Amino acid sequence: MRIDELFWNDENVGHLWSAHQVTPDEIEEIIFGVEGEEPTYRIRRDGDFYCISGETGSGRLLNMVGELLENNRFRVFGARDMNQKELRAYRRGK
């Protein structure tokens, strides 16, 4: 799966912050990488949705859920810090 652009609106930005204090910038760092580095996220499909795990430029480890839209745009529904089980699985798969 290729992601060229992230879809943001007031609803998903507000939910990310109010529920888990995650910013759009953190999501973009995971998907597109930080300057001079390639992104290193893991992705898996769960029905119509995708679960993406990755690390921000500051080292925060997040899981996010969203859907692929037309033209390789991706809408994030939610994101949160990884729990211990997810963290172990992410580190094993890197």
Q: Which sequence ranges carry the predicted segments?
A:
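Ribonuclease/tRNase effector modules and their secretory precursors
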Residues: M1-K94
